[in-house]
Amino acid sequence: MDFGLIFFIVALLKGVQCEVKLLESGGGLVQPGGSLKLSCAASGFDFSRYWMSWVRQAPGKGLEWIGEINPDSSTINYTPSLKDKFIISRDNAKNTLYLQMSKVRSEDTALYYCAR
């Protein structure tokens, strides 16, 4: 039997199991002054052990860090200009990160990403 081939298959399967996935949802159109809650479903890693962040990218601009939350939600840090508008939370039982947006304005138009 070719042990090199067996090792390759095992390594390949292990790689598939360790694939990190972050899937954002909840975006859409909202009226000025309105609110919106984004979700980020995580898989492929132990979500409850990691700090998680939200970042955004407005059209034609670079990435802007919104904030981060520690594994047990006891520490949450925000970009100062956004801390009164956005609330970051998480549910470790559901492997999900949240971004509650309020007082939304046109300058909040962006692609929003969660990050580990």
Swiss-Prot record:
InterPro entries: Ig-like_dom, Ig-like_dom_sf, Ig-like_fold, Ig_V-set, IgHV. CDD domains: IgV_H. Keywords: Adaptive immunity, Immunity, Immunoglobulin, Signal. One of its GO terms (biological process) is adaptive immune response. Gene3D superfamilies: Immunoglobulins. Residues 19-116 form the Ig-like domain. Residues 1-18 form the signal peptide. This is Ig heavy chain V region 441.
